[in-house]
């Protein structure tokens, strides 16, 4: 039995293409892998606090007493990291906003990236500590950006996930959604076909 963690990060709730596609993934995965356990975390509905000068102090090893706000941030960071490490498959629904990931997803990464916990520095360079996982990124875009200079989502997510130790990453693209109903329907259809292929593998 595998454990699957689905991270939603769209601000558009049910209208979101990435949310709809991640829901489709959950339906298909549940049908094909009925014994697996699926956890869904909606980072827009339940937002992660923005990392600031006070909160960053909670995430660095120190003997200094923590403020109540820092204690909350550290506890949340511990919870998010434990959840991430406890799952085998990580599904990230990542809409493109202004060429990059959403603020909601970035805030999550900022609390998950902790030296000595999810990565460490060695004499050979950084080493990821969140290993043995597979990641599936479902990314929706209004325009066409794949493989072009305006796609900052794909390289950023590949780099971040690899940095913490997740190197088996597959991407599902839904592009051209803003180009009209026909293109949006084709984008959904193509993305669902890609999801079907991943689920069946």
Swiss-Prot record:
<dbReference type="InterPro" id="IPR023048">
    <property type="entry name" value="NADH:quinone_OxRdtase_FMN_depd"/>
</dbReference>
<keyword id="KW-0288">FMN</keyword>
<comment type="subunit">
    <text>Homodimer.</text>
</comment>
<feature type="binding site">
    <location>
        <begin position="96"/>
        <end position="99"/>
    </location>
    <ligand>
        <name>FMN</name>
    </ligand>
</feature>
<protein>
    <recommendedName>
        <fullName>FMN-dependent NADH:quinone oxidoreductase</fullName>
        <ecNumber>1.6.5.-</ecNumber>
        <ecNumber>1.7.1.17</ecNumber>
    </recommendedName>
</protein>
<comment type="function">
    <text>Quinone reductase that provides resistance to thiol-specific stress caused by electrophilic quinones.</text>
</comment>
<feature type="binding site">
    <location>
        <begin position="140"/>
        <end position="143"/>
    </location>
    <ligand>
        <name>FMN</name>
    </ligand>
</feature>
<feature type="binding site">
    <location>
        <begin position="16"/>
        <end position="18"/>
    </location>
    <ligand>
        <name>FMN</name>
    </ligand>
</feature>
<dbReference type="GO" id="GO:0009055">
    <property type="term" value="F:electron transfer activity"/>
</dbReference>
<keyword id="KW-0285">Flavoprotein</keyword>
<dbReference type="InterPro" id="IPR003680">
    <property type="entry name" value="Flavodoxin_fold"/>
</dbReference>
<comment type="function">
    <text>Also exhibits azoreductase activity. Catalyzes the reductive cleavage of the azo bond in aromatic azo compounds to the corresponding amines.</text>
</comment>
<keyword id="KW-0520">NAD</keyword>
<dbReference type="GO" id="GO:0010181">
    <property type="term" value="F:FMN binding"/>
</dbReference>
<feature type="binding site">
    <location>
        <position position="10"/>
    </location>
    <ligand>
        <name>FMN</name>
    </ligand>
</feature>
<comment type="similarity">
    <text>Belongs to the azoreductase type 1 family.</text>
</comment>
<dbReference type="InterPro" id="IPR050104">
    <property type="entry name" value="FMN-dep_NADH:Q_OxRdtase_AzoR1"/>
</dbReference>
<dbReference type="InterPro" id="IPR029039">
    <property type="entry name" value="Flavoprotein-like_sf"/>
</dbReference>
<dbReference type="GO" id="GO:0016652">
    <property type="term" value="F:oxidoreductase activity, acting on NAD(P)H as acceptor"/>
</dbReference>
<dbReference type="Pfam" id="PF02525">
    <property type="entry name" value="Flavodoxin_2"/>
</dbReference>
<keyword id="KW-0560">Oxidoreductase</keyword>
<dbReference type="GO" id="GO:0016655">
    <property type="term" value="F:oxidoreductase activity, acting on NAD(P)H, quinone or similar compound as acceptor"/>
</dbReference>
């Amino acid at each position: 039995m595998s454990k699957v963690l689905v991270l939603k990060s769209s601000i558009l709730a049910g209208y979101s293409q990435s949310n709809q596609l991640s829901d489709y993934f959950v339906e298909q995965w549940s049908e094909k892998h009925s014994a697996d356990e699926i956890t869904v975390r909606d980072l827009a509905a339940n937002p992660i606090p923005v990392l600031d000068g006070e909160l960053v102090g909670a995430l660095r090893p120190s003997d200094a007493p923590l403020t109540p706000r820092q204690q909350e941030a550290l506890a949340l960071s511990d919870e998010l990291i434990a959840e991430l490490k406890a799952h085998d498959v990580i599904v990230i629904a990542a809409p493109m906003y202004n060429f990059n990931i959403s603020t909601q997803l970035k805030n999550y990464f900022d609390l998950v990236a902790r030296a000595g916990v999810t990565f460490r520095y060695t004499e050979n360079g950084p080493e990821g500590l969140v290993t043995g996982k597979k990641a599936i990124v479902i990314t929706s875009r209004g325009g066409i950006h794949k493989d072009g200079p305006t796609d900052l989502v794909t390289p950023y997510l590949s780099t971040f996930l690899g940095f913490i130790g997740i190197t088996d990453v597959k991407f599902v693209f839904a592009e051209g959604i803003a180009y009209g109903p026909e293109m949006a329907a084709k984008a959904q259809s193509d993305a669902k076909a890609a999801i079907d292929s991943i689920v069946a593998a």
